[in-house]
Regions:
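Peripheral, non-catalytic segments flanking oxidoreductase cores
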Residues: 1-317
Length: 317
């Protein structure tokens, strides 16, 4: 009908053996879909069936066990980088709590984390399953990175340098159900400081993403299969792509009386984020100067916390 308003919807992309096979026509067309989704929305839902149901359920079980630990135990999970260790008891976000494993997917760091949480416990099952799960999510994240680079014609030149600088943060997240008089906002609106985030969640509450024109898209996990992952681009990805990729403002909204559990794998670059010269031309002049990813994280935790647009303030041209 003329004049009908079409509400924006989260793009859904199925990732299969066929379209993940590099060089095929299906791979190239899916690469274009992913690029368009990230440029327009900064996020997409990926249907990905290679994570065994039993492993996924075990991981959410581990998350529940972790958050039942005493606060003094969880506080042992520390890191110099804000957001990489334990977070909770936030005045502005009373429902949210998280625990992070730096170098998520690596055996040594996972063992260290498990021994902190359960110093007298049997941590073998937790470690084996967490490493296996993290590696599976890292594999699909790697496949998506390759496809984005392919879509920009940058795969051969930039894949290895980017991948060599990658490190992952594995995070367990809990949003408890709100009490009668409490806010229903699990996580305040924010943009990610990671390069990319891959989020897996149980079927509770909503994840909402804001579009470029200020509208909110709602992802209701209860209406999707358990094989659905959410990819969310972070601000450093926006900078690297010279503004092409959108980093969306997003938030978590709670409903009902169940707790929400999520698993997230965030990618960070150990070195410099730099716009490829191929993405700079007369029509697309350089928007961002080169910067060190972890120095940017420190800035966001200090002076940048006062800025409306910390990325522009820190490295905008």
């Amino acid at each position: 009908m003329a004049g009908e308003v079409v509400e924006p919807k989260l793009p859904i992309i199925e990732l299969t053996d066929e379209n993940l096979m590099a060089g095929t026509s299906s791979w190239k067309s899916t690469s274009g879909e992913i690029r368009r989704a990230l440029e327009e929305y900064g996020c997409f839902a990926a249907v990905y069936k290679k994570v065994p149901t039993e492993l996924r359920e075990a991981m959410f079980g581990h998350g529940k066990e972790l958050f039942q630990l005493p606060l003094e135990t969880k506080l042992q999970n520390t890191c110099d980088v804000l957001g990489f260790g334990y977070g909770g008891k936030f005045l502005s976000m009373p429902l949210a709590e998280y625990l992070g494993i730096e170098n998520g997917g690596a055996v040594d760091s996972t063992n260290k984390f498990a021994n902190q949480m359960w110093p007298n416990g049997n941590t073998q099952k937790f470690c084996e399953e967490t490493v296996s799960y993290s590696k599976l999510i890292a594999e699909v994240d790697d496949a998506v990175l390759r496809m984005i680079l392919e879509s920009y014609g940058l795969l051969e030149k930039y894949y290895e340098p980017l991948k060599d600088s990658y490190m992952y943060l594995m995070r367990f997240i809990k949003y408890r159900s709100p009490k009668m008089d409490e806010t229903k906002i699990g996580h305040l609106p924010h943009k990610d400081r990671s390069f990319m985030g891959v989020i897996d969640t149980n079927q509770v509450g909503f994840l909402e993403m804001q579009t470029r024109d200020g509208k909110w898209i709602t992802f209701d996990p209860s209406t999707y299969t358990n094989s659905t992952l959410i990819f969310v681009a972070g601000e450093p990805f926006t900078a690297w792509s010279n503004g092409r990729v959108y980093a969306p403002l997003h938030r978590v909204i709670m409903k009902g009386d169940e707790d929400k559990y999520s698993l997230a794998l965030f990618s960070f670059m150990r070195g410099i984020v730099e716009v490829p010269e191929e993405l700079i031309d007369e029509e697309n002049p350089q928007q961002f100067k080169s910067f060190h990813h972890f120095q940017y994280l420190k800035y966001c935790a200090t002076d940048g916390s006062k800025e409306k647009d910390p990325l522009k303030a820190y490295c905008g041209v």
